[in-house]
C-alpha cells in the first residue's frame, strides 16, 4: 500500500494544482484580445521582414561565392 500511495501522491498533487489553475484562469475580454492579436501580428510582421531582408542580402552573396553557375 505504501508504494501505491507514493506513486499516487504526485498525481493527486498535479491534479489538484491543475484544477486550481483552471479555476483561476479567465477568458480575455474583447479589448485584451485585440491587444494580444495586434502584438502577435506586429511580431509576425517584424519576423517576416527580418527574414525577407536576410534572404535578400544572402542571395547575391551566395551567387558571388558560388560563381553564378
From Swiss-Prot:
This protein's UniProt keywords: Endoplasmic reticulum, Membrane, Protein transport, Translocation, Transmembrane, Transmembrane helix, Transport
Major location (coarse): endoplasmic reticulum
Membrane topology annotation: Single-pass membrane protein
GO cellular component, one term: Ssh1 translocon complex
Protein origin, superkingdom: Eukaryota
Residue ranges annotated as Cytoplasmic topological domain: 1-40
Compartments where found: Endoplasmic reticulum membrane
SUPFAM superfamilies noted in UniProt: Preprotein translocase SecE subunit (SSF103456)
Biological process per Gene Ontology, one example term: post-translational protein targeting to membrane, translocation
Gene Ontology MF annotations: protein transmembrane transporter activity
Family to which this protein belongs: Belongs to the SecE/SEC61-gamma family.
Biological role: Necessary for protein translocation in the endoplasmic reticulum.
UniProt subunit comment: Heterotrimeric complex composed of SEC61-alpha, SEC61-beta and SEC61-gamma.
UniProt protein name: Protein transport protein Sec61 subunit gamma
Organism of this sequence: Dictyostelium discoideum (Social amoeba)
